Amino acid sequence: MRRFVLWWREGENSVTGRCFDIGVATREALTDFHRTGKLAGVGRGDPNRAGNGSLMRLAPVALFAAPDPDVAATLAELQSKTTHPAVVCQAACAFFARLLVEAIAGGDKEEVLRDRKLGERGVVGAIAAGAWKTKTRETISSSGYVVSTLEAAIWAVGRSDCFEEALILAVNLGGDADTVGAVAGQLAGAIWGRRGIPPRWLEKIAWRERIEERAMALLEAGKRPSRATPIGLISSSGHRER
């Protein structure tokens, strides 16, 4: 959370040197933490507070946790609790983390996007079971609601044969296009890899070398025995254990 606050207030790790386009839920959570030093749990049971902010930043968790989907799911829930503690946000992040880890481990699109029964009930469980496959361009939603973003991203990747096609389809859904694109990009990148990204796109990425170096560092850090430390130090309630 302190890192998030530094990004918000001082622009740390922002390519422009300042925070921009921060979501409402994230801003409120960071404001509360900056004031109290505690996680406030804003909007835990409010479906109107179930935004996509914790889903769009998930890739580093999957890189660190690879190739263990259970570790990835646990860390994904914990990172969501910091700013988006709603149960549906945690569930969406946990499910998506599993997809990312399987793809990073070499799973192809059909394997990663297979119908699943993960014990999740409700909307996230329906997506896991393949409900997105029946959607059309006219019926898919690309709003800022975490479930809509999750489904739209998976739908775009599932209907595409390469990274470029998936991203163009995702962002052209409109709505919360940048976040839907970010989520689709995580999954498409994990499935098709760096080589699947058009070189002309890679050339335009700000801080490209820095991002690539940190991605590799996360993968290497995840291989160490101390990888489980973040889980061991934090209980299921989200509080640090003594």
State the predicted function of each range:
Residues 1-242:
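Structured, active/binding-site neighborhoods that engage oxygen-rich ligands
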